[in-house]
């Protein structure tokens, strides 16, 4: 499905000018929602959020901001930068990773200012959640770093520098 995403323009077009967003909105939106599900780290909590959102906003006219705030509250994570990145820009963030013998440094690039979003990494075949920002952070390992990749369920790109 990601191969069909052109990232030609933001999902949310400009308001008040009768101009729609990207034709990618369904495929890209699907990937964004799936990534959000991963961020919840618990399928039951994610589905409970969707049910609560349906109940809360039943038969109302709402805005994207209403949904974004609701999901942030239910997840316990400030996702404002996440939504700004994925809904209001066409770009997919890139996790820049610099490997060392016993760990790695990482930060988000090709993203909005002060972007932050958790991401699940596979480090020596073990799942590890990290919370990158646009500033460098580090993760040290006790054993030698043999294998490193991003979980494919996270909708982002990764660039590893040896």
Language model segments and positions:
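Post-HExxH zinc-binding segment in Zn-dependent metallohydrolases
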Residues: 1-10
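Compositionally biased, intrinsically disordered low-complexity regions
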Residues: 5, 58-61, 129
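Edge beta-strands of extracellular beta-sandwich domains
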Residues: 154-162
């Amino acid at each position: 499905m990601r191969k069909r995403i052109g990232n030609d323009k933001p999902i949310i077009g400009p308001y008040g000018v009768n101009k729609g967003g990207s034709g990618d909105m369904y495929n890209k939106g699907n990937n964004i929602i799936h990534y959000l599900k991963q961020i919840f780290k618990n399928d039951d909590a994610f589905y409970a959020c969707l049910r609560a959102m349906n109940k809360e906003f039943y038969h109302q006219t709402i805005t994207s901001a209403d949904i974004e705030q609701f999901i942030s509250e239910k997840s316990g994570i400030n996702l404002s930068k996440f939504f700004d990145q994925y809904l209001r820009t066409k770009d997919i963030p890139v996790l820049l990773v610099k490997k060392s013998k016993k760990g790695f440094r990482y930060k988000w690039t090709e993203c909005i200012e002060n972007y932050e979003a958790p991401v699940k990494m596979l480090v020596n075949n073990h799942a590890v959640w990290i919370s990158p920002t646009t500033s460098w952070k580090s993760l040290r390992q006790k054993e030698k770093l043999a294998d490193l990749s991003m979980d494919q369920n996270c909708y982002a790109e990764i660039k590893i520098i040896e």
